[in-house]
Amino acid sequence: MIMKKKQPGLPQYDSPLMDADSIRNSLSAHMTFSISKFPFSATTRDWYESAAFAIRDRLVERWMETMQAYYREDSKRIYYLSLEFLVGRTFSNAMLNLNIHEECKAALYELGQDIETISDIEFDAALGNGGLGRLAACFLDSMASLNLPCYGYGIRYEYGMFHQAIEDGMQVEHPDNWLRYGNPWEFPRPEVLYPVKLYGKVVGYKHEDGTTHHHWVDTEDIMAMAYDTPVPGYGGKTVNNMRLWSAKSSRDFDLRYFNQGNYIQAVADKNESENLSKVLYPDDSTEMGKELRLKQQYFFVSASLQDILFRYKKHHTSWDELPDKVAIQLNDTHPSIGIAELMRLLMDTHHLPWERAWSLTSKTFSYTNHTLMPEALETWPVSLFENLLPRHLEIIYEINHRFLRDVMHHFPGDSDLLRRMSIISEDGGDRRIRMAHLAIVAATPLTAWRSCIPN
């Protein structure tokens, strides 16, 4: 049983229905055309992937309709930036939200398969490890269920966290290679590719209007490639998008080194670049580990903001409406470097003056803090920013200068208050950037989300 879809703006196709017979037919077709196996030789994983593709077919249609509706209505979108998304297993969640669990169970039973056995094959997506990631996943699920236009942005970790085991009485860690067999729920988007700059130096120049602008030059560039995953709300009416970034080298293979017999160096740049999206929370007990963590945070934030601005500019010629169409939520301090990055993009790429860029930025970001413990409030050495993100350090200095000037105006003579409220900590001579302070200074109240809620 199939129903012909004739919705304007979408490709014309035969739409699969939600009954058990249609699901069984889809599953059998995918076993042949997607997996390319006979049922008698198929493994349990083959059956899982065939079933996942059959369910995904029913998600994609609603996903495309949801995205088209957002563009058609020019909806204000919520962009949820998080270093973690502990989404769990998509197979059971998708069946539940589409209300087709029993139909899938019956379809698999008719093919001689048990749905519980099939469900157990799926790996947990190693995209988070605790409450922070679970909260982010719940937010995406809830916003889809409430029909809110939302995108999740994060990193597509290749190994995520690690499996822990006890060997000879000692705790050991093994990589969680959750992508070993691929991921049937994601869609690679190789055409969605953004450069992310690191290191380099900043040079000033005079614009044609006489104002001073800045170039960030001599940088090392890493490419961010998008992978999209549909996020269905309960009932399946709205299917939002989670876009995760994978690091790709801008210099994949150096043939010169290879021809000289230096095979390791030939792929060294590629390997170093792609380390950014290998592991969630790399060990930061060393200086290299700290740098890798900050690189990770900036990598996904920069790619996400470039993507957000690209989407906005496709339908708007003026920046004035940015806060009315874009709400960016920072999940803890990890993505708070996005404040300086949005300022950089607006000023250096789109040539907006400081005052206008700051007005737009401070009306666009919201921030959620999860703890008040000092050890959990992220700070970074100024020296690390000087080396890795020199332009952002300049912007943070200017934000702090203007903020402290306002504090001094309202509380004259209170030098201790200035010290405590400054974005730059100088305790013990160790100058550090307090990311929670930066997020609070720039963020708007969460009531800004209300304009995203349909009447």
Where are these regions (language model features)?
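A conserved ligand/cofactor-binding region detector
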Residues: 2-455
